[in-house]
C-alpha cells in the first residue's frame, strides 16, 4: 500500500531551500500559476508555496489555493521526480474555481515529469 502522507520531509522549509530552486529552475506555467522545479539529491520531491497578498487579497482564498495545491502534490508525490518545487501564484488565480485549479496543477505536474525525463 502506497502511503500518501504529507510529512515535514516533503516541504521546503527554509529560505535557503527556496533560493536553491530560484537559482536554476525548470519552469512550467499557466497565466495564473507557475511551478518552478530543480532536481534534488534526496530521492523524493519537496514542495514550497508562495501566494502573495498582492495577487490574492483575502486570506481564505490564499488558504484555499494552498490547501488545493498541497493536496494535489500529496496525491501525485510518488509519480513526481525527485525535485524541489516552488509554486508561485500569479494574478488571476483567485478567480479559478477548485476544479479549474486542480486541472491546471495536474497539467503542470505532467509537464514537469516530462521535463525531468528529458533532461
Curated annotation (Swiss-Prot):
GO terms for biological process: tRNA 5'-leader removal. Keywords: Endonuclease, Hydrolase, Nuclease, RNA-binding, tRNA processing. One of its GO terms (cellular component) is ribonuclease P complex. It catalyses: Endonucleolytic cleavage of RNA, removing 5'-extranucleotides from tRNA precursor. The keyword Acyltransferase does not apply. It comes from Erwinia tasmaniensis (strain DSM 17950 / CFBP 7177 / CIP 109463 / NCPPB 4357 / Et1/99). RNaseP catalyzes the removal of the 5'-leader sequence from pre-tRNA to produce the mature 5'-terminus. It can also cleave other RNA substrates such as 4.5S RNA. The protein component plays an auxiliary but essential role in vivo by binding to the 5'-leader sequence and broadening the substrate specificity of the ribozyme. It is an enzyme of class 3 (hydrolase). One of its GO terms (molecular function) is 3'-tRNA processing endoribonuclease activity. The gene is rnpA. NCBIfam families: rnpA. This is Ribonuclease P protein component. Belongs to the RnpA family. Consists of a catalytic RNA component (M1 or rnpB) and a protein subunit.
